[in-house]
Amino acid sequence: MPQLDTSTWFINIVSMILTLFIVFQLKISKHSYPMHPEAKTTKMAKRLTPWESKWTKIYSPLSLPQQ
């Protein structure tokens, strides 16, 4: 049964990693980023819901006094 020749595996793997690195660097360098990014202002209409007109208080179990 013949032995598997693995002598070329190292150079194949190294060249593949190098090629992928170069390709990704070129892809990233060609990407155009906005020069001055700014936050978008969103105008939301204020809707009055039934529970907003009433006073409610929610008690968290951790904020209750110790017994």
Curated annotation (Swiss-Prot):
One GO biological-process annotation of the entry reads: proton motive force-driven ATP synthesis
Q: Where in the cell is the protein located?
A: Mitochondrion membrane
Q: Which GO terms describe its cellular component?
A: mitochondrial membrane; proton-transporting ATP synthase complex
Q: Which residues carry this modification: N6-succinyllysine?
A: K54
Q: Which Pfam families match?
A: ATP-synt_8 (PF00895)
Q: Please list the GO terms describing molecular function.
A: proton transmembrane transporter activity
Residue ranges annotated as transmembrane are 8-24
- The primary site where this protein sits is mitochondrion
Could you list this entry's UniProt keywords, alphabetically sorted.
Acetylation, ATP synthesis, CF(0), Hydrogen ion transport, Ion transport, Membrane, Mitochondrion, Transmembrane, Transmembrane helix, Transport
Q: In this chain, where does the modification N6-acetyllysine occur?
A: K54, K57
Query: How does the record say this protein sits in the membrane?
Result: Single-pass membrane protein
- Subunit: Component of the ATP synthase complex composed at least of ATP5F1A/subunit alpha, ATP5F1B/subunit beta, ATP5MC1/subunit c (homooctomer), MT-ATP6/subunit a, MT-ATP8/subunit 8, ATP5ME/subunit e, ATP5MF/subunit f, ATP5MG/subunit g, ATP5MK/subunit k, ATP5MJ/subunit j, ATP5F1C/subunit gamma, ATP5F1D/subunit delta, ATP5F1E/subunit epsilon, ATP5PF/subunit F6, ATP5PB/subunit b, ATP5PD/subunit d, ATP5PO/subunit OSCP.
Q: Which family does it belong to?
A: Belongs to the ATPase protein 8 family.
Function field: Subunit 8, of the mitochondrial membrane ATP synthase complex (F(1)F(0) ATP synthase or Complex V) that produces ATP from ADP in the presence of a proton gradient across the membrane which is generated by electron transport complexes of the respiratory chain. ATP synthase complex consist of a soluble F(1) head domain - the catalytic core - and a membrane F(1) domain - the membrane proton channel. These two domains are linked by a central stalk rotating inside the F(1) region and a stationary peripheral stalk.
Question: What's the protein name?
Answer: ATP synthase F(0) complex subunit 8
Lineage of the species this protein comes from: Eukaryota, Metazoa, Chordata, Craniata, Vertebrata
